[in-house]
Amino acid sequence: VIKTSLSAGTLALAALAAAGSALPSASAQIRAPMVQANAESAPVGYASMNGGTTGGAGGATVTVGNAADFVRYATSASPYVIRVNGTITLSGMQDVASNKTIIGVGTSGRVTGGGLDLDSVRNVVIRNLTFTGAGDDAINVQDGSTNIWIDHNDLSNARDGLIDIKRGSDFVTVSWNRLHHQDKSMLLGHSDGNASQDTGKLRVTYVHNWLDGTTQRHPRVRFANPVHVFNNYYVNNSGYGAASTENAGVLVENNYFENVEEPTSIQEGSSDPGNIRAVGNHLVNSGTPVTRNPGAVKAVPYPYTAEAGGAVKATVTAGAGVGRI
């Protein structure tokens, strides 16, 4: 498993460097985030490419506990590391500007009522937050957003999707999240008619996620090639695991499927079929992964190490979700 050590002072140094030029309000103190030494300091996969994904590094670190302060810093043109200590209640989809790290404090950081909308932005990190009860999506990445890292969150009970990525967004890593109590989990590409914007984009890595009893879309892919789905733990997914449609190319590698009748799918709804290469997956009381044109799935363009499929359940259940970084 790829694991790198995070220097405890990395984000603190960034905050100190900018403290003289950006003075937070009294309700938002400058502090160093408390991050355990075993957390990854940078994303694995696509979000490590295209210049990398650092979020608000280089800006001030602020702590917020209410929606007003959260919105003020999340929409600022300046870089910020925003520590969420408490419940942020939103009334709808809340815009997040470029160059932001939004990270929960311990297990106390929560977003409810609404979700986060990353629209035409670059370089955003969302970590260690509990999302529940969104009136639409919990996290929506769209309109050409790039270099996004969604890591170590707990997501459930959204009205639509939990993590939807669409409209030409690119260079995204979704890692170490726990998804539960949800039908539609992770959409990648929103429409069969959006080939012109999506082809050659929507490159996403899904790694070390815990798909815990969710029904479908883990992910549901259109057009993108290659999408890399590896070292995830699927359990009790009554619809399907990963789906490839509209000539997408998806590598489904070294995942652990438990009680999943249909680990992979190449046909959903009215979409044309996609291509899947499935290798090294560990199956417990699960069906055989369906593949199609595995040679059409492009090579993954970044270095990585995949853990053996049989070890993934223990790794993911010990490390995914909030309070684990």
Go through each PLM region and give its residues.
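Extracellular "leader-to-stem" segments immediately downstream of a signal peptide or signal-anchor
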Residues: V1-P79, G287-I325
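Short aromatic-glycine motifs in intrinsically disordered, low-complexity regions
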Residues: S48-G55, T89-Q94, S244
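Residue-level detector of conserved, well-ordered beta-strand and adjacent loop positions
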Residues: G65, I103, D151, D164, ...
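Extracellular beta-strand-rich solenoid/capping regions of secreted or surface-exposed proteins
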Residues: V71-S78, G86-I103, G109-N128, T132-S145, ...
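Right-handed parallel beta-helix
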Residues: S98-V105, R122-G133, S145-R159, S169-H190, ...
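Structural detector of coil-to-beta-strand junctions
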Residues: G115, A138-N140, L162, S185-L187, ...
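Extracellular beta-rich repeat passengers
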Residues: F223-N225, F230-Y234, S238-I325
